[in-house]
Structure formats: structure tokens, C-alpha cells
Curated annotation (Swiss-Prot):
The keyword Methyltransferase does not apply. It catalyses: Endohydrolysis of (1->4)-alpha-D-glucosidic linkages in polysaccharides containing three or more (1->4)-alpha-linked D-glucose units. InterPro entries: A-amylase_bs_C, A-amylase_pln, Alpha_amylase, Glyco_hydro_13_cat_dom, Glyco_hydro_b, Glycoside_hydrolase_SF. Redox-insensitive. It is found in: Secreted, Extracellular space. The keyword Cell wall biogenesis/degradation does not apply. The gene is AMY1.1. This is Alpha-amylase type A isozyme. Its cofactor is Ca(2+).
């Protein structure tokens, strides 16, 4: 192929990669679970065989596990950040191949960035593990105890700055106010982009450092998106269920987005407010899915362009099951997030292991076919204990819940295009006709 032809192909691929982001059509996919590191032959190699199915389902971004050496097998206790070959998921060459395969299908790769804390390779003169090795032959990321927050007294030498966020007891909390820490972490993030091919970030335990510090790393590395895990407890009643009013919870998430730069920033948050409310709502309390202003009750209702919605992830579900979605109602959860505003995230387990691949893909197809975006208009038509019905952009209607007699609230001119266990989706006649012809 000539030079001009190669340039043309590259430009087309770049347009494909950027299309979802520019238009708000992102559909995320978490490409691992808590047990993925155990995969025989390596997780990255196994995932090579899943790329076609993921891309065919309309996914725009795949979130991959932490890429570096880690004291814990899962990757969340990182040490030598440049040492990719030591990962339990596979080596650097295998990771590059996987990212290349994703890019070849127009799908971006999200790196799981764990920078709140870090594990040291060596002890200092006190016998404390606080001497860090970066994983290169030079001094990059080779830090000492003066890079550990001084209020992390178990590890620090007392000379650094105070922690800007929540404590992480299991490993040293890194001083993100330190100029060298900021500079070398930004260099590492840029290397993840330039050398490995990553496009975007998922910020692990983002409560551990201030949003102002997150802004430094987002602004300094220009990811296509940076979705943060800011997981706080929800206010609950005496029965253990979440209170109806979760405005304080979602306000905290909105505040994080504001402080990293708001609409101008690539920063966004996982919508833990929606997750918690939806968990409870599908148990016969679907009245929860509307706030007093008639909007969705999570971050989705206030700032949908910055709300990454999800049913479960490697922490809430998988084998950890810290906060699992009701297992017999998972597809109700997907019917909700895949038809609604916000940026939905599909979990690997539900797609590949639970037998929901075709149903989830059908819902994504409806989303794409009707041009539903992160900021689509939501009109809630019914919100009772056993039935929730909503219209999106005047093009799609969705019902979740056990009640079947909801025909009276379905607008004229809509026909059923997807249905399953206690959920159904309708499209306008024109969209349904297009589906039948295709």
C-alpha cells in the first residue's frame, strides 16, 4: 500500500476511535473479574479471542486490569510500575497485542490506574518497607519514605505532606503534593499511552487523593476519558435499605467532577448512587427510580454526561460480591442502564459467563440504532413498586418490573423490539421496521 493509502487508513481508524467519545455514544466494558489473573495461558491471550464479540456488541472502550507488577495477584497493590512483564495477566508483548486488536476494531483501551498507594521493594534502616523500585534501569519512580504521606505513620519518615484524601491501610499512601511524584507519575501514564497503547484511565480508589490531584494527572496526560472510583457509603435506614433521598451521596460525586475541571475535563465518575438505588429498586421498590424533580435519582439525573452507570464490577460482584446486584434481576439492570442517559458499563461476567451476551448486545443495538447518548432526554412515565416505565428521546420506551399491564402508558406508534425476564423495550415503528429489514 502506498504512503497516501496508509495515511488514509490511519485517519479512518482514528476517526473510528474518536467517534464514540465525540458524540457521547460511549459504551464501556469491564474486561476482567476478580479471578482473571488465574487464567491458564494468561488473561490477555484469552481476551484476544473475545475482541470480535466485544466489538460486535457495540462496545467503544474496554477497561483492562492494572498492568504493572503487584504484590497482590489481582494488581491492586502495585510496586514496580514500569514492570509490565511481572503482571499475572500476561506480559507486555501480550498486552500490546490485545490493545492492538482492540484498536483494529475501533475500540479504545482503558488502563486501571492504581496510584493512591504503592508497595515498596526494600526496607530502610528502620526495617520498614518504604524503598520503592520503579522497574527500570534508571531512577524513575525509585522513591523513598519522603514520598509517603507523613500521616501514614506506619511507613512515612514524617517529612512529606499530609494525605489529601482517605487513608489506605494496607500499603503506603503516596504524597501526591510532591513535585517529583507528580512528574514521574505523569511520565509513566504517558508511557502507558505511547508504549503500550492505552487511551483512557480508570482511577482506582480515587477517594484516596483529592480531585485536585486527580486533575493534575488528567490534565497532564490527556486521556480520552478518565472515570474515577469514588465509592462512599450511602445513607441507610434501620432496615439496611438506602434512604430514598440520596442527594448528598450524588452531590459528592458531582463535586469530584467539578473539581477536576467539570465539563471541560475528561474526568467522570462511576455512578455509585444509581448502582445502590437500582440494587434496591428492582426488589419491588421501583418507585425509587425518580427524584422529587422527576429526574433519575443518581448522578445520571444531575450530570449524565459524567455518569458511568453499571450493574456490577469486580468488587461489587464477581467472587468478592461486596455489593452484588440481585442475581435474578441482572437483565433488568441492563435494560435500565443501556436505554438511559449516562455512559453504561457492561461487566465481563454478565456478558460472557452468565449467558446474557445476546440480550445485552440487543439492548446496545437499540441504543445505537436510536442514537441514545449520555445526554439523551429522559421522561419517566410510571414509577410504582412493580413497574417502572420511561421514554428516552421520544424514540425508545423501556419497562422493568414484574407487572405486565403497562400498555396504557406506552405511547402510540411503539412496537416491542426486545424483552426478557421482567423487562421489555419498545421502539418507534420506523426503527423497528429498519431492524426487520436489516
Amino acid at each position: 500500500m502506498g504512503k497516501n493509502g496508509s495515511l488514509c487508513c490511519f485517519s479512518l481508524l482514528l476517526l473510528l476511535l474518536l467517534a464514540g467519545l465525540a458524540s457521547g455514544h460511549q459504551v464501556l466494558f469491564q474486561g476482567f473479574n476478580w479471578e482473571s489473573w488465574k487464567q491458564s495461558g494468561g488473561w490477555y491471550n484469552m481476551m484476544m479471542g473475545k475482541v470480535d464479540d466485544i466489538a460486535a456488541a457495540g462496545v467503544t472502550h474496554v477497561w483492562l486490569p492494572p498492568p504493572s507488577h503487584s504484590v497482590s495477584n489481582e494488581g491492586y497493590m502495585p510496586g514496580r510500575l514500569y514492570d509490565i512483564d511481572a503482571s499475572k495477566y500476561g506480559n507486555a508483548a501480550e498486552l500490546k497485542s490485545l490493545i492492538g486488536a482492540l484498536h483494529g476494531k475501533g475500540v479504545q483501551a482503558i488502563a486501571d490506574i492504581v496510584i493512591n498507594h504503592r508497595c515498596a521493594d526494600y526496607k530502610d534502616s528502620r526495617g520498614i518497607y518504604c524503598i520503592f523500585e520503579g522497574g527500570t534501569s534508571d531512577g524513575r519512580l525509585d522513591w523513598g519514605p519522603h514520598m509517603i504521606c507523613r500521616d501514614d505513620t506506619k511507613y512515612s519518615d514524617g517529612t512529606a505532606n499530609l494525605d489529601t484524601g482517605a487513608d489506605f491501610a494496607a500499603a503506603p499512601d503516596i504524597d501526591h503534593l510532591n513535585d517529583r511524584v507528580q512528574r514521574e507519575l505523569k511520565e509513566w501514564l504517558l508511557w502507558l499511552k505511547s508504549d503500550l497503547g492505552f487511551d483512557a484511565w480508570r482511577l482506582d480508589f480515587a477517594r484516596g487523593y483529592s480531585p485536585e490531584m486527580a486533575k493534575v494527572y488528567i490534565d497532564g496526560t490527556s486521556p480520552s476519558l478518565a472515570v474515577a472510583e469514588v465509592w462512599d457509603n450511602m445513607a441507610t435506614g434501620g432496615d439496611g435499605k438506602p434512604n430514598y433521598d440520596q442527594d448528598a451521596h450524588r452531590q459528592n460525586l458531582v463535586n469530584w467532577v467539578d473539581k477536576v475541571g467539570g465539563a471541560a475535563s475528561a474526568g467522570m465518575v462511576f455512578d455509585f448512587t444509581t448502582k445502590g438505588i437500582l440494587n434496591a429498586a428492582v426488589e419491588g421498590e421501583l418507585w425509587r427510580l425518580i427524584d422529587p424533580q422527576g429526574k433519575a435519582p443518581g448522578v445520571m439525573g444531575w450530570w449524565p454526561a459524567k455518569a458511568a452507570t453499571f450493574v456490577d464490577n469486580h468488587d461489587t460482584g464477581s467472587t468478592q460480591a461486596m455489593w452484588p446486584f440481585p442475581s435474578d434481576k441482572v437483565m433488568q439492570g441492563y435494560a435500565y442502564i443501556l436505554t438511559h442517559p449516562g455512559i453504561p458499563c457492561i461487566f465481563y461476567d454478565h456478558f460472557f459467563n452468565w449467558g446474557f451476551k445476546d440480550q445485552i448486545a440487543a439492548l446496545v443495538a437499540i441504543r445505537k440504532r436510536n442514537g441514545i447518548t449520555a445526554t439523551s432526554a429522559l421522561k419517566i412515565l410510571m414509577h410504582e413498586g412493580d413497574a417502572y416505565v420511561a421514554e428516552i428521546d421520544g424514540k425508545v420506551v423501556v419497562k422493568i418490573g414484574s407487572r405486565y399491564d403497562v400498555g396504557a402508558v406506552i405511547p402510540a406508534g411503539f412496537v416491542t423490539s426486545a424483552h426478557g425476564n421482567d423487562y421489555a423495550v419498545w421502539e418507534k415503528n420506523g426503527a423497528a421496521a429498519t431492524l426487520q429489514r436489516s
